[in-house]
Amino acid sequence: MAYRAEPPDGGWGWMVVLSAFFQSALVFGVLRSFGVFFVEFVAAFEEPAARVSWIASIGIAVQQFGSPVGSALSTKFGPRPAVMTGGILTALGMLLASFATSLTHLYLSIGLLSGSGWALTFTPTLACLSRYFSRRRSLAMGLALTGVGLSSFAFAPLFQWLLNHYAWRGALLLVSALSLHLVACGALLRPLSLAEDPVVGGPGAQITSLLRHGPFLRYTVALTLINTGYFIPYVHLVAHLRDLGWDPLPAAFLLSVAAISDLVGRVASGWLGDAVPGPVARLLMLWTTLTGVILALYPVAEAPTGLVALTMAYGFTSGALTPVAFSVLPELVGTGKIYCGLGLVQMVESIGGLLGAPLSGYLRDVTGNYTASFVVAGAFLLAGSGVLITLPHFFCFSAPTSKPQDLVTEALDTKVPLPEEGLGED
């Protein structure tokens, strides 16, 4: 396959964006909406809610910790077979879950098997997308990740309708069929060879190189800190509002407000990430700082107007930081190592995601309210912002019209003049 000097910034890349849109919807849209099965599982197996909640927790943990496996397979064989295999595993897990007779079966089928399938789909797809775009990378990421928000609106009522008409076993069969569309998403991931790709060295050599790369390690620490506080409103905002005397329906509706703002923020940030000159890390630091401040202000707001305004602002800024967070990594490690780099980041930052909600709940139990929970969550994001400013070129303003990836492109396009014939002759 011929090597391209730079990403095409379009062409088949838009089909990869389409694939990533549906893939993000079929992975995280399903995960976000899977709570509608929660009550059905509790009633069917007569198990406590705590044990049932482990189904989704295992699936998320396997998806995140298994990301390096998906990255390694994509580096070795390409993203297409990795994602298509992941789609088959996801559908098979949901299919087997429909025959479950105990929670252990659901742990193994949905948690382990479908979780493994999700691990093989999400990271390779976004990494492939990063290789197709350079100057429009942030916009492409923003458009692709809107699939999460849109599917969160659609899947929850859809799954409830399926439960009402086909019971939970029939609904899981149909979710299995829906998940098979991940195979089609994988088929759209056409391999792309770039001049920046490593000539030698497999996934192991790339991982070793990344673990010795200071900026990559600092970026991973920053995202882990951000991830620790990022999801707190989605987990505890409704409970916080109930403590303030809100009814359940308006409290839940506020999350829908955040989801709408999230969609707008992702697209707007994607456009700004490509339009504003300089490293994308600056924009990521801005959105992260604003999100941290908003979280810390939640305990101060008690009036409904203030809470609605804060939630709209949180949805926008938290959605805005997502596409630029994925766009910073190619600037740090290059597109040649993006598969392994993104897999490692996903694995490490999952530690923050797993610890954030339990820590927030612990602070609620100790203090009796969610004041400390939101303040500490905001502090984690502000700490992540502090780490981001240590990244290379963050304070470099000498060439405000060029982005780091543009400098790489210019270097690749530079033509060195060859000596003319007869040079040196008398």
Curated annotation (Swiss-Prot):
It comes from the Eukaryota. GO terms for molecular function: monocarboxylic acid transmembrane transporter activity; symporter activity. The keyword Membrane applies. GO terms for cellular component: Golgi apparatus; Golgi membrane; plasma membrane. Residues 1-10, 395-426 are cytoplasmic. It is a multi-pass membrane protein. It holds the Pfam family MFS_1. It is found in: Golgi apparatus membrane; Cell membrane. Keywords: Cell membrane, Golgi apparatus, Membrane, Symport, Transmembrane, Transmembrane helix, Transport. The chain crosses the membrane at residues 11-31, 52-72, 83-103, 106-126, 139-159, 172-192, 221-241, 244-264, 283-303, 306-326, 338-358, 374-394. Coiled coil: none annotated. InterPro entries: MFS, MFS_dom, MFS_MCT_13, MFS_trans_sf, Proton-linked_MCT. Disulfide bonds: none annotated. Proton-linked monocarboxylate transporter. May catalyze the transport of monocarboxylates across the plasma membrane. Belongs to the major facilitator superfamily. Monocarboxylate porter (TC 2.A.1.13) family. This is Monocarboxylate transporter 13. It comes from Bos taurus.
